[in-house]
């Protein structure tokens, strides 16, 4: 029954982890016309599925056995919720009578993700087949702009193939209704110096660039980051622009997902704000929201561009000039990478410092137009970055590079523990001997615990972890070694890691001096 319901959807793919209780599900899904991968680690498996859904713009699902295995789906579920990604997690469960009665691999798992879901389905062995079929239909119908949990209790036997029993016809899918025309609130219709913030944007939503350019022509200031999928000449770099100050700003519109620039949010605090998104939460980023609208991001942006009055006085570009940096450090590494990646690539950015270097260099116009930029900026820390990038390339088949830190790569050490061959993902690991970002802020240093409790200063490398996961491995410690290693790394026919060793103190100095004195 479940397999028949799933067969009606166009899946980006599905990922399973080994386990007994999920055996009936795996046996049912094996004939689905969708790519399938098996990963040992459930945390990595869910992030693989997340990456596939993001890259393909179609739902993906992950399957696991009962007990704590299901809890390991949690980080990917939370990321999918805040990044508005159609991720389905299917958790096998034990019959309800066995929960809390001393049985192995049995926990209270029906509601473990409830606060971070857009829908769920709890199957029940005591109900009829048609009742359970309706539960599955309802869960699948809600699989849009966020994660859904399907919990499936299974009684033994688990491995026997039994004749299929047909349930009633599949429930109706939601009707496709023409979107309502967006109505501009007064704060925007009467604004003279409005600002549009374009947050993280999934390419499957549609091309935001034409509407953004039309708004800029009409006199709007547009600010964004590379995760907006906009070319850098279509918008100003969000944080650096706001650092220059916008004294006559009278309205802010935010659309899309999360954005990185923490200081920018503080700069905009108190500004009159209109937030647009497909569902809750529609965040009050500046403590001053005056209007909220529910709409598909692409449709809303088009309507805004069509309806916004022509203000007749475009903003002048507001970009700070970057200072030259010397020597081999993180800034030099990121500049070198930016100049080597062509427009047909997908770039995945690790959290912490990599995405911040990407933001800065995007604002300097260093990335080729057409590159798609991705990162787990919904809510995640360093978890699941390699897994998400692998799942993304697996689904998209586009050349893909992940730029991440050594702690992030080590943390996601289950990413490559797959049964089938890995996609030929390229990973640049910037090894600055710890969590570099904690050197950028004063609190950790003043605590006296910077190296131990915050930065986790170390002398490790990722070579053994990379090779254990099936990546070929190269390393470099200066620009000459980097240039020598790059051609074979980027052209490797399989998955490959290039680890770049940098000095953390020189990297800190270059970052803090990026605009000069």
Regions found by a protein language model. Give the residues of each.
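Glycine-rich phosphate/diphosphate-binding loops that line cofactor/substrate pockets in enzymes
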Residues: 1-11, 52-57, 81, 139-144, ...
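Structural signature of the thiamine diphosphate
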Residues: 2-5, 10-13, 55-64, 70-75, ...
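Active-site diphosphate/adenylate-binding microenvironment
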Residues: 2-3, 7, 17-28, 316-397
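Glycine-rich, acidic loop regions that bind phosphate or pyrophosphate groups
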Residues: 80, 90-136, 224-318, 419-420, ...
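Phosphate/pyrophosphate-binding active-site segments
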Residues: 127, 267-355, 461-465, 470, ...
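N-terminal cofactor/phosphate-binding cores enriched in small/glycine residues
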Residues: 1-63, 69-72, 78, 361
